[in-house]
Amino acid sequence: MTDGVPVKSRMVEPTNERARTAVTLAVLGGRIARERFDGASGVVWKTDGSMLTQADLEIERRLEQEIAKRFPADVVLGEEGTGQERSHLEGRYWWVLDPIDGTNNFGRHMPGFCVSVGVLCDGTPVAGAVYDPLSDWLFTAWAGGGAWLNGSRINAPAAPLSPRSLFALRSPWPDGLPPFAHGWLARYRLRRFGSTALHLCYAALGGLAFVHDHRASLWDIAGAAIVLLEAGGSITYADGRPLFPIAPNVAKEPIAFLAGNCVAHRLALDDVGAAHQVAL
């Protein structure tokens, strides 16, 4: 490590100031998370049943302060809402922050969490950084610049699905798993690491063939979506509609998405569509 940034990541410099800042902020947040990890305390439960720690609040507040100093006209949308967020997402540039994606792991002193920073322009991801401080894995991407892990270029291989394929699925499902998910469990191998952003980054690496989440938030995916897209992968709503550009009036709504390498994504979409046709 040098100045808190993995040495290999210094081999590739993002081409614009917002992308560089996204990387800086993800690493800054990750350093705070790592310092607080062993003594994580102050756990509370939010009304939606998710965990919140003091580290979530501390990291988000710090990142928002840095953004306000560097880009005062930009909008910030953070999971915990610690800053003076605008009620409407006006403006071209949005900073979408998940201070700790995987808080349920972090708060239990388990690995499987990260800091995610995404930059959207007119509703489309243009830069992102996802940092896992325990593994020291830093995923970065910016529009037209490719996807990177600690300075090495990554690509999502266009591999078809097979019995050896791994996929990630959100839980819980209060109304029970839908038929297409039962089919996936019968044919492929489930992995769940507890962080949507890391799931998407693992798909960009080719480790996961596809990822499905029926109730994600924009901050869960904003930083990692461009990593997957720049790696050659795909992400859409679960019904196949384009996810981006995302409109301001729906940016805070739950998102059901499907993502993965371009081949697996298409095949998984076919499964979802077929199940819906049967239901009709």
PLM regions: where:
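Acidic beta-strand-loop-alpha-helix segment within the catalytic core
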Residues: R10, V117-C201, L243, A247-L280
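Active-site-adjacent structural elements in enzyme catalytic cores
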Residues: K69, L77, E85-S152, I226-L229
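N-terminal subdomain of lithium-sensitive/metallo-dependent phosphomonoesterases centered on the IMPase/IPPase/PAP
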Residues: M1-I100, V278-L280
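Residue-level detector of anion-binding/catalytic polar loops
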Residues: A73-V75, R189, A209, S234
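Oxyanion/phosphate-interacting regions
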Residues: T2-T24, C201-L280
